[in-house]
């Protein structure tokens, strides 16, 4: 799945089409009928963690009518969600990881109403969640780089193609799309690429007793962080992926957060400059020091297991009886 920097790049590609009308559609999507986008206007584009949100509206007269018909329960629900997320972002002490409102691990805290088709006149946002090789192409289609398992050189088929009034088009590949009938309500405090990323909230989450590699992938606290960033940040901080966060001193946790933010920002900058991000441990057989790298699938019991690379020498595992003050810095 594309991580935060990649989805930010997709958002950058889509932004020039905001304000244009869809004049032609295509694609293989079965869940969403591509023709349902015909004549809609792309009015806004937002990115939150690993998800992209696109707002589509009919003409202004229809939008005005739809907003006036929006039910009061829906409006009240949106206001409550916005108020709660604002409180969490401004006052981390009000946030409770064990409360009933907690979002399951792996969710990035988005609160929306969903469905397969847009309600007439209601505010409609298309939520785009990308698969492992998900992407967006502008004014071009993806071409096969190698033969498939059957030996065919077939080009990938886009899920959705939108041609706009400005003569350009967008092609969406390997993604899931769902209509949302209210604005995405999120807390930028959890977005690792946001200027409002809340380090204190992140450090509190990392200090748990569970293996630190589990916490890093929890989108409630590190929205946009994926497997590549996880592996690279842990290696650069010299932390074993299975080390419980509670055994790590604050300086090491702060260093880990620094590496998460720095690596993510460098990756994003490279995306815009067209350069490939350099990795030191991800998918490597040896670390930069020449040590043999271990690869293993790690994840919470009953949860999703992710391939993890680490160097046993550069990232020694901590024992429960090791005093924090004696841990390597």
From Swiss-Prot:
Active site: 2 (schiff-base intermediate with dna), 3 (proton donor), 50 (proton donor), 306 (proton donor)
Keywords: Acetylation, DNA damage, DNA repair, DNA-binding, Glycosidase, Hydrolase, Lyase, Metal-binding, Multifunctional enzyme, Nucleus, Phosphoprotein, Zinc, Zinc-finger
Zinc finger motifs (FPG-type), residue ranges: 280-316
Gene Ontology BP, a term: base-excision repair
Chain sites annotated for binding DNA: 227
Modified residues (Phosphoserine): 68
Statement: the UniProt record of this protein carries the keyword Lyase: yes
Documented EC number(s): 3.2.2.-, 4.2.99.18
Role of this protein: Involved in base excision repair of DNA damaged by oxidation or by mutagenic agents. Has DNA glycosylase activity towards 5-hydroxyuracil and other oxidized derivatives of cytosine with a preference for mismatched double-stranded DNA (DNA bubbles). Has low or no DNA glycosylase activity towards thymine glycol, 2-hydroxyadenine, hypoxanthine and 8-oxoguanine. Has AP (apurinic/apyrimidinic) lyase activity and introduces nicks in the DNA strand. Cleaves the DNA backbone by beta-delta elimination to generate a single-strand break at the site of the removed base with both 3'- and 5'-phosphates.
Family the entry assigns: Belongs to the FPG family.
Protein name: Endonuclease 8-like 2
Naturally occurring in which organism (per UniProt): Bos taurus (Bovine)
Lineage start: Eukaryota, Metazoa, Chordata, Craniata, Vertebrata
């Amino acid at each position: 799945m594309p991580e935060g920097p990649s989805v930010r790049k997709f958002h950058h590609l889509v932004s020039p089409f905001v304000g244009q009308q869809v004049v032609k559609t295509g694609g293989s999507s079965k869940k969403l009928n591509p023709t349902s986008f015909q004549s809609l206007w792309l009015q806004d584009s937002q990115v939150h963690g690993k998800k992209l949100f696109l707002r589509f509206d009919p003409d202004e007269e229809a939008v005005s009518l739809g907003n006036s018909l929006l039910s009061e329960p829906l409006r009240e629900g949106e206001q409550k969600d916005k108020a709660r997320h604002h409180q969490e972002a401004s006052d981390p002490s009000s946030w409770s990881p064990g409360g009933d409102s907690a979002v399951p691990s792996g969710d990035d805290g988005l609160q929306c109403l969903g469905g397969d088709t847009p309600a007439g006149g209601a505010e409609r946002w298309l939520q785009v969640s990308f698969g492992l090789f998900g992407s967006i192409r502008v004014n071009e289609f993806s071409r096969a780089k190698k033969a498939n398992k059957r030996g065919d050189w077939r080009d990938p088929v886009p899920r959705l193609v939108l041609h706009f009034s400005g003569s350009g088009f967008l092609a969406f590949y390997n993604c899931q799309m769902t209509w949302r009938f209210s604005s995405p309500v999120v807390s930028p405090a959890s977005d690792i690429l946001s200027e409002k990323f809340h380090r204190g909230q992140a450090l509190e989450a990392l200090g748990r007793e569970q293996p630190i590699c589990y916490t890093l992938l929890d989108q409630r606290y590190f929205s946009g962080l994926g497997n590549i960033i996880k592996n690279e940040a842990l290696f650069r901080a010299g932390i074993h992926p299975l080390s419980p966060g509670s055994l790590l001193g604050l300086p090491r946790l702060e260093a880990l957060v620094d590496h998460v933010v720095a690596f993510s920002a460098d990756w994003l900058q490279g995306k815009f400059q067209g350069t490939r991000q350099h990795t030191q441990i991800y998918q490597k057989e040896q670390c930069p020091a020449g040590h043999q790298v271990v690869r293993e699938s790690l994840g919470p019991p009953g949860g999703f297991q992710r391939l993890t690379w680490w160097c046993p020498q550069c990232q020694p595992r901590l024992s429960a009886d090791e005093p924090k003050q004696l841990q390597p810095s």
